[in-house]
Amino acid sequence: MSTVDSSSHTPMMQQYLRLKAEAGPLLLFYRMGDFYEMFYEDAEKAARLLNVTLTKRGTSNGAPIPMAGVPVHAMEQYLARLVALGESVAICEQIGDPAAAKGPVERRIVRIVTPGTLTDDALLPAKADRALAAVCLSGKRDPRAGIAWLNLASGEFHVTECAPAQLDSELHRIGPAELVYADSTELDITYSGARSRVPDWHFEADGARSHLLTHFQTDSLAGFDIEDMPVAVCAAGALLRYAARTQSQALAHVQTISAERAGMYVLMDPVTRRNLELTQTLSGEEAPTLFSLLDDCRTPMGSRLLRRWLHHPLRENAPVAARQQAIATLLSARLDMAQTFGAAGLLETLRSALGLFPDIERIAARLALRSVRPRELASLRDALATLPQLQTLVAPLSASPRLAELATQLTLDPAIADLLSRAIAQEPALAIRDGGVIASGFDADLDELRLLAADSGEFLVQLEARERERTGISNLRVEFNRVHGFYIEVSKGQTDKVPEDYRRRQTLKNAERYITPELKSWEDKVLSAQDRALAREKWLFEQVLDALSAYVRPLSDAAAALAELDALGSLAEHARRHEWVAPDLLESAEIDIDAGRHPVVEHAIERFTPNHCRLDATRRMLLITGPNMGGKSTYMRQVALIALLARTGSFVPARRARVGKIDRIFTRIGAADDLAGGRSTFMMEMTEAAAILAASTSNSLVLMDEIGRGTSTYDGLALAWAIAQRLITHNRALTLFATHYFELTRLPSEQATAANVHLAAAESAGGIVFLHEVREGPASRSYGIQVAQRAGIPAAVIRHATRELERLEAQGAPTPQLGLFAAALDAEAQTQAQADHDAENAALLALHEALSGIDPDSLTPREALEALYRLKALQ
C-alpha cells in the first residue's frame, strides 16, 4: 500500500493503518461488525478478484478511500477463492468489547491464511494434502539442498536432504502448495506453486536449531535422527517459525519430526509422474488416473494416504510385504468369515464401518489449533461410539502383523468419548457464538441461566393476556426482535386506548410499539441471563477444548490407523473385484510379468489383450517395434505401473508377477514443445534422455519411446543407437526401448542382454487389425499406410507416398522406416498409381530443366519472384 499519513484520519482508520503495516503485502480482512472490510489497494484488489462491490468510506488527502467488504458468515468461501488464486490473507478480529470500548474496539491479527497453511475443511481438498515446504541451500563447497515440509492439517513434519540437482524432483514428489525460502536464495526449479520469501536469518543454523529444540521441548535432536542433516534442520526451523506465525500460536499438534533418507523410496522425476498419470492425466484432469481407479476409500484420510503411497513407492521389500500380507489377510478373511458376517463378509463389513468415521486426522489438528467446530466434535463423539465395533472387526485379522499393530493404535482412552458425550449437545449449533453447543446437564450454572431465559415464553404469554384485559385491545401483541428487544405492539386504530405507563419504542406505518416498566424490567433480566448463558457456554467450550487437547496425539495415531485400514481395504476390494494377484518380491532388480494388463486402460475398453514382460540380468533391454497405434506406449506404461503398484504393496493386474528392488523409474514418452522455456520438441526429448543417462542405474526401470524422431533420419538413428547402447553397456538399466528405426533391431546381435519384441498386427480384407499382442522378434513393417488411411489422409496422398517409397527403395534408401509404405495396393490402385507416376515424371523433368537455368546468386528480388511464378506454373 502506498504511504498514507495516518495523523489526519479517524482513530479507527489509524488503527487499520497500523494493522495493515503489520500485515505487509497480505490482504487484510479487517473485522467491522458483521463484515470484513478492506481499504485502499486491498479493496481494489479484492473487488477485482472476488467480484464484490467497490465503494468508499471517508477521505485521505482529499480523495475518497476505496472500501470493499465480505460478510463474516461467508468469509470461508471468499477465502477459498483467494487462496485458489495464490493470495494470502491476514484475518483481523475484534477482541475487545465494543460496549466497553472508549475508542476503537481492540483488534489484532489472529491468523494468516496462505496456500500452504490451510486447516479449515472448507478450504482444503478432501482427498489431497496441502503441504507447506521450506528449502535451504548450503554453500558452494559442499552443495546440499535441505527440504522440510509440514502438513498443518495433520501435524506430519518431515525433512530430507538431496543434491541441488535433485531438488526439483523432490519438490514434485512432495507436492507442496507453498514454498518458503530465504530472500537471497535463487531457485532454478519448475515448481509452480505459491512462493513466500522470508528474511535470511530465519534459516541461520543456530536460530533454526534453537527454535526446533524449544518447540519439541528437548535438549537434542538426536532422538529424531536428524542430527546429520544440518541443511534440512535449517529449513525445518524456518518452516516451523513461519507456520507458527500464520496461526498466531504454537503448533501443539506438531509433536515429532521424521527424516526421509535416500533409499527409502523409488524415485521418479516430474516427467515420469506426469507420463504415468498417477494422480493427474496428461491434460490436467483428475480422472482417469491410477489414483481415481484405485480410490474406493470410505474416508478422506484413507484417500489421502493412498495418494501418498502411489507417489512414494517403497524400495525395501519388508514394508511392501507387510502391506501385501495385510491385503491378503483381508481377502482371505472375507471368505473364511462369511458365515459370521453374512453374505457381505468381513471385508465389506469393515469398509462399511469405516464409512461412519469423519476426518479425525484434520479434526485432531483443528482441536490443537483451537479452531475445531462444535459439529466436528459431535461427529467425533458419534464416531468414537462405533470404535469398539470396528475393533471387533479388526481383532480376527492378527495373521497380518501390520493389521495387529493397527488394531492396537485404535485403542483410545474412554475418557475422550465420555467427555464428548457429556459436554456436547446432540445437535450443536454451527458456531459457539450461536449458543446451544454445551449439552444440558453438563453445567448447573448454565442450566439455571438457560431455564431463566426459557421461562420468558410463559411470562410473555401471561403478560399479553393481562394487558389485553387491562386495555381492552384484543389484538395487542407482546413480541421480541434483536434490534428493539421486547415490545408491545398496538395497531394505529387502537392507540387511543393505550395506558399512560406505555412508553413509545418504535413507530410503524400501521402500528405503534411500546414498552412498560414491567416489560423493561423483565427484558433486562432475560437478556442479562441470555448474555451470561452465552458467556458461560463459551467459557465451558474452552474448558472442553483444554481437556481434549491432551488427547491430540492418540487421536492422530488412531486417525492414521483408520486411514491405513481404509487404504488397505480399498486395495483389497479392487484386487478382489478385478482378479489382481500378489506379486512375488525379489531382492535383485528384475521384472517378470505373465499376462499383465494396463490397470487404467483395461477399464476404458471392452477387451484388453494381456502381455508378458521379462527383464533381468540376462535380458536388460527390450527393443520394441511395431505399427503406430499398435500399443507400444500402452505396453511400456503398463509394465511401469505394474512395477510401481508392486512397490507400493498393492496386488497387480496380471496372472503372475515377480518384481524386484527398483531404485528409480524414468520415462521418455510423448512429445511437446516447452514454449515458455524456448525449447523445441527435440530439445525436450534430448534433455529428458540426458537426465536418464546421467541418473539411471542397473536397478532402474527406463522407458524410452521413439527417441530421435524429432530430427533428421540420420541424426535420429545415430542418437537412438548410441543412447540404447549406452543404456545397455554403461547404465545397465532395465529398459523398454520403443523405436521406429528398423536398424536398431540389429542391436541384440551385438549386445547379448538386448532382445527384440514387437506389437503384432494382421491384415485382412477390411484393412489392418492391431492385435496389441507382444511377440518375440522384430516387426516386419509399421503399417503406417493403413494408419494414415484410417486417419482420413486423402487417397491421392496415399498413392503419392507409395510411389515415393518405391523410388527410395529402388535407389537403395538407407532408412526404410520399417517399410512404412510397403503395403500392397489392389489392381485398380496399381494401375492408377502407374499413370500418376508417368505424369509426375514428366512434370519433374520440366521442373528440373527450369531449375538448372536459374542462378539464385545473380537474381534481383523482382527476377526471383518472376522465376518463382514460372516454377509454380509447372506444378
UniProtKB/Swiss-Prot annotation:
Domain of life: Bacteria
Binding-site list for ATP: G626, P627, N628, M629, G630, G631, K632, S633
InterPro entries: DNA_mismatch_repair_MutS, DNA_mismatch_repair_MutS-lik_N, DNA_mismatch_repair_MutS/MSH, DNA_mismatch_repair_MutS_C, DNA_mismatch_repair_MutS_clamp, DNA_mismatch_repair_MutS_core, DNA_mismatch_repair_MutS_N, DNA_mismatch_repair_MutS_sf
One GO molecular-function entry: damaged DNA binding
Biological process according to GO: mismatch repair
UniProt entry keywords in alphabetical sequence: ATP-binding, DNA damage, DNA repair, DNA-binding, Nucleotide-binding
One Gene Ontology cellular component annotation held by this UniProt entry: cytosol
Similarity field: Belongs to the DNA mismatch repair MutS family.
Function: This protein is involved in the repair of mismatches in DNA. It is possible that it carries out the mismatch recognition step. This protein has a weak ATPase activity.
Protein name: DNA mismatch repair protein MutS
Naturally occurring in which organism (per UniProt): Bordetella avium (strain 197N)
Lineage, broadest ranks: Bacteria, Pseudomonadati, Pseudomonadota, Betaproteobacteria, Burkholderiales
